[in-house]
Amino acid sequence: MQLLDDDFLLDNDMAKTLYHDYAAQMPIIDFHCHLNPSEIYQNKNYTNITRIWLNEGTYGDHYKWRLMRANGVDEKYITGDGDDYLKFIEWAKTIENAYGNPLYEWTHLELRRFFHIDERLTAESAPRIWEKANQLLQTDDFKPRQLIKNSNVQVVCTTDDPASDLHYHQLLKPEEAANGFKTLPAMRPDQLMQIDRDGFGDYLKTLGKVAGVEIHDFATIVTALTQRFEFFNKMGGRLSDHSLLTYHFEEATPAELDAIVAKGINNAALSEHEINQYLTMLLEALMKLNTQFNWTMQFHINSDRDLNRPMFAKIGPDTGYDAVGTQPDIVNHISALYTKMQQTEDVPKSIFYSLNSNDWLELATMMGCFQGGTTQKLQLGAGWWFNDTAEGMTQQLQVFAQQSLLPHFVGMLTDSRSFLSYPRHEYFRRVLCSFYGRLVEQGRVPNDAAELGRVVQNIAYNNAHDYFDFF
């Protein structure tokens, strides 16, 4: 088999039929990404392939940056002020050593699908690819909106602070029909959840100002959040997203909670117990709001952030210095949270992503305890980040199928900062079709292409269409 030929990742006849005849043509709903809505609105061409592929300063693809560091590249040519062409050359030298890494496949998929470049990216081919790619990047087809539209994307959900005015979402909303896709906000209240961080009090002032609420205790935090849910909902928002690096379920009385909030506002020292109390009560409030507005609550758990502290101090977060977290009992504490909220029927639609694949079976069985009322109300999210590989995707599909109803899965998301990442949906669909094809070969599911074709089309698109209520 040749590199990335028509049947790559499709290792049996049924897989080939399912992908080519059913999954490939389905539209995309990208319900979690980190695209900048201002770039979608402004719709400017990128100067060169480095700017769209690698970085704009310290904002960019930290997946690639990690590999470049492993290849011995000087930081000047990763997040620094090195020449864009030389950065691209260093990436070419890196990727030619990345056999077996998903970035090798993604890189060449993107070259083929967007630039129609079949040549392998190497140090030798890099100058030619640089020239051809940069010529194409100046055309209308390579403006952000056209890249999204040409990728058959119907919905893009960005990641937005609750204090955001959603300025660019508002500007894009009347242009949805012309664009051919929706750009919708998804609320991510990281700054509100981090009561122990410097600047928490200042953040509450910012949130209160946009919400028209003077925040001075926990009740006024909830009042402000409710207003922001109303605003995001009006703008088409249907999801929230919550990062739990670690978590312990520890509740607080109203008096204890207000005292904790006062400490946070005044930047006073907080104990681990107090931090967990605040986070638990905030999550309970957020679950109630997600239920009230019929949103989906996403949890990204068990990641270990910013391990290289000198580099974090130098260039900030999300720059490639994160790893898999190892809190062994985190699912037990999430279970306790859901047990509490089930008592008042405030369990929202939920998707769980753990960076530690050892959590997946426990999460999948926990999900089964709180299903009901909505088809596959609780979902095990697609393999995330370091698990975003053919093997990681397959493992996630296996756990989901064995513990719940995989045909109801809402499927793939890019979780990306790049407009060139949509081939990840193709990659996932190929893995999905091979997964079902192998079950056919083993005599474990019907040898019925039409029936399984319906299933893969649902996972590729239809389930997300119905589950999130974007339309």
Curated annotation (Swiss-Prot):
The UniProt record lists the keyword Transport: no
Membership in a protein family: Belongs to the metallo-dependent hydrolases superfamily. Uronate isomerase family.
SUPFAM superfamilies reported in the protein's UniProt record: Metallo-dependent hydrolases (SSF51556)
Gene that encodes it: uxaC
GO molecular function: glucuronate isomerase activity
Enzyme class: isomerase
Swiss-Prot/TrEMBL keywords: Isomerase
Annotated source species: Latilactobacillus sakei subsp. sakei (strain 23K)
Entry's Gene Ontology BP terms: D-galacturonate catabolic process; D-glucuronate catabolic process
Name of the protein: Uronate isomerase
Catalysis performed (reactions): D-glucuronate = D-fructuronate; aldehydo-D-galacturonate = keto-D-tagaturonate
Family annotation (Pfam families): UxaC
EC numbers for this chain: 5.3.1.12
Pathway: Carbohydrate metabolism; pentose and glucuronate interconversion
